[in-house]
């Protein structure tokens, strides 16, 4: 079961006496107990303000001025607030267990008006742990707190996750949220709804029976049913529109003949004049255009001649300028040839000198070799002389040393002395002072090893020395060669530079070998380049003459084209005469054909207009007569189909109307006889009992009762038996069920519910299986849903029926139009367009005339073209052989490349010529540069040192060997003293000395002779070097002179220079010849221009005269055209068939129409004046003004609510169709209105019965309510007798009063009011209009009378009035009425709110001390039974046993007024429990 929403607490912030107070509200009764001024009313006022924050309604009477005669500015709220921000908040929990805090922010507005500013807000998603006071206050310290403004509260809540804060700008939005969330019972859409809610709360607050509520119980308890009123208002509007439309159609129909006549004559009058002016303008324009064409042609010829003159003058100027350039180029070419010849002679001298230098170079090299050999012989002689000197010196020393004796003693003495001397020498040489003869053998081995090592080292150095001696002279020679080639450089760089020079020499020799091939290639390419330049010049000249640039790929095709053109031009010139004759013959044939077509054109145009109208009407395109006849057959078939479909739709619409009428019966009875039987049997229809069943439950109950769903429920079946005897006026099957209609339930059957079906056990041996119907009709909601769908279907069917009716009539009229068309125009309409053919023939005629007039010019142009083509072919014959050259874009680049390569090769040749011999000499000896020759002296010193070391080692070893060999001689010490004399050895030494001296003399003489010869060789070498240097210097001077000349003096240079000179001479001759030709042509062109200028002046004079005539009429014609286009009448006036009539015929036609129009507009002053003004022939635009005025007059007469078009012609065509269709629609709606007069009575009666049942159910909840002597309270609902009579007449006797409902002057509401007056003539209606009375009669609430009755003591049921009841009884009775109103609102709003929400119920009761304990207990019981919360205020002597009681005591503490609150929950035997958070210490807002 859905739990009902509850108010959890009320929070007051900064109210008078309450700074921050939260009252937890009991689920039933919350009592505010306290003395006067304790704050009970303030608390209730805060609750009401949060519930209804509408300052226009809030009025707390117990705080306003008593006895005041004028309205109080303070309605009780301003004085209950303290300065600053105030809050009143309601904490609620709804049926969905959602916590919602709603409230208002209040603030006093400064001023004498004592106004209060109110801002409502709502908070959703707030956790249960957060108290309302925590939200709106901020604790500053233990004794102080601050109230947060609304914007800070918003920021604080937005920072909390899941919490939503909403501020409302309107009370309607605030109450809408409260209704959707189940806080209030009714949706308060307007100020009137809020006023009712406030009056309810106010009546609850102050107690008693509220006259404001009891007087308007119908507004509180009965919901407004505006459906009937709105339906009949819509019906009245539709009927009013239909009647106005019908009247407008009749008026339009009466004007139809006038429309036709006025349109026809106005069109003839204006269109004839319009087309006549158009024809005249076309003729004048044709003449002007012809003159302009001739003028344009002459101007073109003159412009062509001028262009030709300018072109030839420019070409002549170009040739004059080119002649000077060519003369300068020719002179430069001649000078260049002379320079080339001079350079060639200079080159021959250079070659002779180079040959001489080569010869001197060879002789110089040979002399160098001779000098080198002489130097070698000189060195040999010096060595020999030096050796002879050494030998003489050695022999002399030997002769002095060896003079011993020849005997043994002398020998032993000598050997002993020699041994001693050898030992001493060995000591000295070996630096061994302790050396003895015995130890000499040991030391000998050591020094022999040293000697061997020194010898090996000396031999190695000797080998190096030998090689170094050989490389020494080569290095110097190679170094000098490198210096000669490269210039001065360091000796250590010679090797790297030499290798680089050799590599460069190889490259330079390779390049030098290419000089001659490159010269030949360059000569060839330069020749091709000159030819290419010449070809480009020829091509540029050709393109300039042709007036178009050509690609070289197009030249061959152009050549063929020009040759073909030459052939074709030669043929065309020969065929010109025959062509001229053929053109004249064709021109005559065209003239006769055009005349015949102009006679046929008007008939064809009339047929086409008729065909276009038919095509527009049917939306089809017809291309043949067969298409027309086939479409006519389709129209017939379509008409039959549309009639059949219209009849079917009409039948279905009638069936829907019948079903709607049947379902609209009160109580859901589909048979009127059942209502009468129910009243006769004293029962109630079962469908009425279940009239309030929901749409979801309708299928179940419909299947549950099955065929008995139309049964009658009677209290006692036995009492019905006598009525059944002889009953005939009843349905075929009549079901009767015994039961209490006031407390009927579905327990009469045993039911098993299946899926979408039920099994009903009617008896032990009889079951019924019924499925849920797809379209249930059981219950008001189901019937209303079905009626709504049927109404929608009926609207669709009505619209479809009207559309089909219109289509049928339109098809019939279209069929008639097709029949007329077939009879009148079918024979000619599908022939070819004569106007199109005329245009083609006229175009061809103009072409023929132009061809004939320009034939001679064409022949002349062809001859000119022939000459130009021949000239072009001649030029192309010179260009085509050079196409390859023109296509070679890289030729100039290749010439530059070859020239650069030739320059490099020539430079290389000069390098080779200058340094070739040095490089050749350097190449075989370059390897000697790897080692520095300056190391030779060091090597020489090393060799000398090694040699000395080897000699020293050898001497040491020899000395030790000698000591070892002479070990035996040391024993000849006794012979040492012996002397020896001379011997033969001395003689031999002397002989050898003489021979050595003689050899020395010979060597010295030879040395002197070779020295003189070497001096001669050096003199010859110096002479050769001087001659070589002189020749070399002369060669360098010649080469510089050749470079200064700046001409490449190769073998073909002279030939190229001569060819270039001859070519320039030929170009100069051609240029002079062309210049002479241009001078002659220019003279002839000037004469032709003079002739064209004279002809042009005459043509301009003729053209301007004709143009002046056209311009004179243009202003009026432009005004006419602008007026025609702006008013969209061109289609009406531009009748092409009139274009073939003569000006006299058109003028006659216009005059006849003018006479008819004068009679037609005689009664219309405006059109008559406009027609009179349009007769001026000089102002054709005034005729258009008349036509526009006539159309505007007709357009204003068209009712736009009937015919949706601005075209009067179309309006005439639609009148008949629209008239019949709308007449039928009006008839249908009137028939519907007759049916609706019965339906409205049924709906009102059904609604009354439903509300009576609902009030009856409400009364059941108040049966046990008692207050004092009042035992029960109930509501009586009765139908007024006058209104019940009206319902009877509407449902049963409406045919007797059809004069009211069929009247075109009365609406349905007015007819209903007249009927009411007719039935109740005694009632005075006052000043109210019938329309107002009729609208009131459509509201079912005006049919009912409601009053509250109480069952009081022995008096029984009495009308509840305050004068007849005690105060407590009045309070209890009033509270009962309010509870009934709240419950009624909930029932009414249940369909508007979610089904899972049961709204909060809360009422107030101030000054409850006027009730006794029994009444208080009754209130508690009522609250518990209805799940209602109640807040009551009572003095301190009231102590209820249930609910929650708050004791309020107002105190003053330190000039601060506050209310002390203590909360108690009931009075049980246990000790009272103080509610948490109710004891409040005084606090002051910061």
UniProtKB/Swiss-Prot annotation:
Keyword NAD: no
GO cellular component: cytoplasm; nucleoid
Region Flexible hinge, residue ranges: 666-783
Signal peptide location: none
Residue positions binding ATP: 34-41
Keywords for this protein: ATP-binding, Cell cycle, Cell division, Chromosome partition, Coiled coil, Cytoplasm, DNA condensation, DNA-binding, Nucleotide-binding
GO molecular function: ATP binding; DNA binding
A GO biological-process term: DNA replication
Taxonomy, superkingdom: Bacteria
Stretches of the chain forming a coiled coil according to its record: 326-418, 444-480, 509-603, 835-923, 977-1115, 1209-1266
Subcellular location, record wording: Cytoplasm, Nucleoid
Record InterPro entries: MukB, MukB/SMC, MukB_hinge, MukB_hinge_sf, MukB_N_dom, P-loop_NTPase
Annotated function: Plays a central role in chromosome condensation, segregation and cell cycle progression. Functions as a homodimer, which is essential for chromosome partition. Involved in negative DNA supercoiling in vivo, and by this means organize and compact chromosomes. May achieve or facilitate chromosome segregation by condensation DNA from both sides of a centrally located replisome during cell division.
Family matches, as HAMAP family: MukB
Entry domain remark: The hinge domain, which separates the large intramolecular coiled coil regions, allows the homodimerization, forming a V-shaped homodimer.
Record-linked NCBIfam families: PRK04863.1
PANTHER family: CHROMOSOME PARTITION PROTEIN MUKB (PTHR42963), DUF4476 DOMAIN-CONTAINING PROTEIN (PTHR42963:SF1)
Family, as annotated: Belongs to the SMC family. MukB subfamily.
Subunit and partners: Homodimerization via its hinge domain. Binds to DNA via its C-terminal region. Interacts, and probably forms a ternary complex, with MukE and MukF via its C-terminal region. The complex formation is stimulated by calcium or magnesium. Interacts with tubulin-related protein FtsZ.
Protein name: Chromosome partition protein MukB
Species assigned in the record: Shigella boydii serotype 4 (strain Sb227)
Primary gene name: mukB
């Amino acid at each position: 079961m859905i739990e009902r929403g509850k108010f959890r607490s009320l929070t007051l912030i900064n109210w008078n006496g309450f700074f921050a107070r939260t009252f937890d509200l009991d689920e039933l009764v919350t009592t505010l107990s306290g003395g006067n001024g304790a704050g009970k009313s303030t608390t209730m006022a805060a609750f009401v303000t949060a519930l209804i924050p509408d300052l226009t309604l809030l009025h707390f009477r117990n705080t306003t001025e008593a006895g005041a005669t004028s309205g109080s500015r303070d309605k009780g709220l301003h004085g209950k607030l303290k300065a600053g921000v105030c809050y009143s908040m309601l904490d609620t929990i709804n049926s969905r267990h959602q916590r919602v805090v709603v409230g208002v922010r209040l603030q006093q507005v400064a001023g004498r008006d004592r106004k209060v500013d109110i801002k409502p807000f709502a908070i959703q998603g707030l956790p249960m742990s957060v108290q309302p006071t925590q939200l709106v206050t901020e604790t500053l310290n233990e004794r102080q707190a601050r109230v947060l403004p609304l914007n800070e509260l918003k920021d604080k809540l937005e920072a909390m996750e899941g919490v939503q804060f909403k501020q409302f700008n309107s009370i309607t939005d605030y109450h809408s949220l409260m209704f959707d969330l189940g806080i209030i019972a009714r949706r308060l859409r307007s100020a009137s709804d809020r006023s009712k809610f406030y009056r309810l709360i106010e009546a609850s607050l102050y107690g008693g029976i509220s006259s404001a509520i009891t007087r308007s119980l119908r507004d509180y308890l009965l919901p407004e049913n505006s459906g009937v009123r709105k339906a009949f208002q819509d019906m009245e509007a539709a009927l009013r529109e239909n009647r106005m439309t019908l009247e407008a159609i009749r008026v339009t129909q009466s004007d139809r003949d006038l429309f036709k006549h006025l349109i026809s004559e106005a069109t003839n009058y204006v269109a004839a004049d319009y087309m006549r002016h158009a024809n005249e303008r076309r003729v004048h324009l044709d003449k002007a255009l012809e003159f302009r064409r001739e003028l344009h042609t002459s101007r073109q010829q003159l412009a062509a001649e001028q262009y030709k003159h300018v072109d030839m003058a420019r070409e002549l100027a170009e040739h004059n300028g080119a002649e000077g350039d060519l003369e300068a180029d020719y002179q430069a070419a001649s000078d260049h040839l002379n320079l080339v010849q001079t350079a060639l002679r200079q080159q021959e001298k250079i070659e002779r000198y180079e040959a001489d230098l080569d010869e001197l170079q060879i002789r110089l090299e040979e002399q160098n070799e001779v000098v080198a050999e002489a130097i070698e012989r000189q060195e040999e002689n010096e060595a020999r002389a030096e050796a002879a000197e050494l030998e003489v010196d050695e022999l002399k020393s030997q002769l002095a040393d060896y003079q011993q004796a020849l005997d043994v003693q002398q020998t032993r003495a000598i050997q002993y002395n020699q041994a001693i001397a050898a030992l001493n020498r060995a000591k000295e040489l070996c630096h061994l002072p302790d050396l003895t003869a015995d130890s000499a053998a040991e030391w000998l081995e050591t020094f022999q090893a040293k000697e061997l090592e020194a010898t090996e080292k000396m031999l190695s150095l000797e080998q190096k020395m030998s090689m170094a001696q050989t490389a020494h002279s080569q290095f110097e020679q190679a170094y000098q060669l490198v210096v000669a080639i490269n210039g001065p450089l360091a000796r250590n760089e010679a090797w790297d530079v030499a290798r680089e020079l050799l590599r460069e020499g190889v490259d330079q020799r390779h390049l030098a070998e290419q000089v001659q091939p490159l010269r030949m290639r360059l000569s060839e390419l330069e020749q091709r380049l000159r030819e290419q330049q010449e070809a480009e010049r020829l091509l540029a000249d050709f393109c300039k003459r042709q007036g178009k640039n050509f690609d070289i790929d197009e030249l061959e095709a152009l050549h063929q084209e020009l040759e073909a053109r030459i052939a074709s031009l030669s043929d065309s010139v020969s065929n010109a005469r025959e062509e001229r004759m053929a053109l004249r013959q064709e021109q005559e044939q065209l003239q006769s054909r055009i005349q015949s077509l102009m006679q046929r054109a008007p008939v064809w145009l009339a047929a086409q207009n008729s065909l276009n109208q038919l095509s527009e009407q049917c939306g089809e395109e017809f291309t043949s007569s067969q298409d027309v006849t086939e479409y006519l057959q389709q129209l017939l078939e379509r008409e039959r189909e549309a009639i059949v479909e219209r009849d079917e739709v009409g039948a279905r619409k009638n069936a829907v109307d019948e079903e709607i009428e049947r379902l609209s019966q009160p109580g859901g009875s589909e048979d009127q006889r059942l209502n009468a039987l129910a009243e006769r049997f004293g029962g109630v229809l079962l469908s009425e009992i279940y009239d309030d069943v929901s749409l979801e439950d309708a299928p179940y109950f419909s299947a549950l009762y099955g065929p008995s769903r139309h049964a009658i429920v009677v209290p006692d079946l036995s009492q019905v038996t006598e009525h059944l005897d002889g009953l005939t006026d009843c349905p075929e099957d009549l079901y009767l069920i015994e039961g209490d209609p006031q407390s009927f339930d579905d327990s009469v059957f045993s039911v098993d519910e299946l899926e979408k079906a039920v099994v009903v056990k009617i008896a032990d041996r009889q079951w019924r299986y019924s499925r849920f119907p797809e379209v249930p009709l059981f219950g008001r909601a189901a019937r209303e849903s079905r009626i709504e769908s049927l109404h929608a279907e009926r609207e669709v069917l009505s619209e479809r029926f009207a559309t089909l009716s219109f289509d049928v009539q339109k098809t019939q009229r279209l069929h008639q139009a097709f029949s007329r068309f077939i009879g009148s125009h079918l024979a000619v309409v599908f022939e070819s367009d004569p106007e199109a053919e005329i245009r083609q023939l006229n175009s061809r005629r103009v072409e023929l005339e132009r061809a004939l007039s320009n034939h001679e010019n064409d022949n002349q142009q062809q001859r000119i073209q022939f000459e130009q083509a021949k000239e072009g072919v001649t030029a192309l014959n010179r260009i085509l052989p050079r196409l390859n050259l023109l296509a070679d874009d890289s030729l100039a680049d290749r010439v530059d490349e070859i020239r650069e390569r030739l320059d490099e090769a020539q430079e290389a040749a000069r390098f080779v010529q200058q340094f070739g011999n040095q490089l050749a000499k350097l190449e075989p000896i370059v390897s000697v540069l790897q080692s520095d020759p300056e190391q030779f002296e060091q090597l020489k010193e090393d060799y000398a040192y090694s040699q000395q070391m080897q000699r020293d080692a050898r001497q040491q070893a020899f000395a030790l060997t000698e000591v070892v060999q002479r070990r035996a001689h040391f024993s000849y010490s006794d012979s040492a003293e012996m002397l020896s004399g001379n011997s033969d050895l001395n003689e031999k030494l002397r002989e050898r000395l003489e021979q050595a001296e003689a050899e020395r003399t010979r060597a010295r003489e030879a040395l002197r002779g070779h020295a003189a010869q070497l001096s001669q060789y050096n003199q010859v070498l110096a002479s050769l070097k001087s001659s070589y240097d002189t020749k070399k210097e002369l060669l360098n001077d010649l080469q510089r002179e050749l470079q200064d000349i700046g001409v490449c003096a190769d073998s073909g240079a002279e030939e190229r220079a001569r060819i270039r000179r001859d070519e320039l001479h030929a170009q100069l001759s051609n240029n002079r010849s062309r210049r002479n030709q241009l001078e002659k042509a220019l003279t002839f062109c000037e004469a032709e221009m003079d002739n064209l200028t004279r002809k042009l002046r005459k043509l301009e004079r003729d053209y301007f005269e004709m143009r002046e005539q056209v311009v004179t009429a243009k202003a009026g014609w432009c005004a006419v055209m602008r007026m025609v286009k702006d008013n969209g009448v061109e289609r009406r006036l531009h009748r092409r068939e009139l274009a073939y009539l003569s000006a006299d015929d058109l003028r006659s036609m216009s005059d006849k129409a003018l006479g008819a129009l004068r009679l037609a507009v005689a009664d219309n002053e405006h059109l008559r004046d406009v027609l009179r003004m349009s007769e001026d022939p000089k102002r054709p635009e005034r005729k258009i003004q008349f036509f526009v005025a006539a159309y505007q007059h007709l357009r204003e007469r068209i009712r736009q609510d009937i015919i949706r078009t601005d075209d009067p012609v179309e309006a005439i065509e639609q009148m008949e169709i629209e008239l019949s269709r709308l007449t039928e629609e009006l008839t249908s709606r009137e028939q519907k209105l007759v049916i609706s007069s019965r339906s409205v009575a049924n709906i009102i009666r059904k609604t009354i019965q439903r509300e009576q049942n609902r009030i009856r159910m409400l009364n059941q909840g108040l049966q046990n309510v008692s207050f004092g002597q009042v035992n029960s309270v109930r509501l009586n609902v009765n139908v007024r007798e006058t209104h019940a009579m009206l319902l009877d007449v509407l449902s049963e006797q409406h045919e007797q009063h059809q004069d009211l409902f069929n009247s075109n002057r009365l609406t349905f509401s007015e007819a209903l009011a007249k009927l009411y007056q007719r039935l109740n003539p005694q009632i005075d209606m006052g000043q109210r209009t019938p329309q107002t009375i009729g609208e009131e009669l459509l509201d079912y609430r005006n049919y009912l009378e409601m009053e509250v009755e109480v069952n009081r003591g022995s008096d029984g049921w009495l009308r509840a009035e305050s004068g007849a009841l005690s105060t407590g009884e009045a309070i209890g009775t009033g509270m009962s009425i309010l509870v009934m109103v709240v419950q009624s609102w909930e029932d009414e709003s249940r369909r508007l709110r979610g089904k899972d929400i049961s709204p909060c119920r809360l009422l107030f009761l101030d000054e409850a001390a006027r009730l006794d304990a029994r009444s208080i207990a009754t209130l508690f019981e009522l609250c518990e039974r209805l799940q209602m919360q109640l807040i009551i205020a009572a003095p301190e002597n009231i102590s209820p046993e249930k609910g929650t009681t708050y004791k309020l005591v107002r105190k003053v503490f330190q000039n601060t007024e506050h209310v002390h609150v203590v909360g108690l929950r009931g009075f049980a035997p246990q000790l009272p429990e103080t509610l948490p958070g109710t004891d409040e210490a005084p606090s002051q807002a910061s």
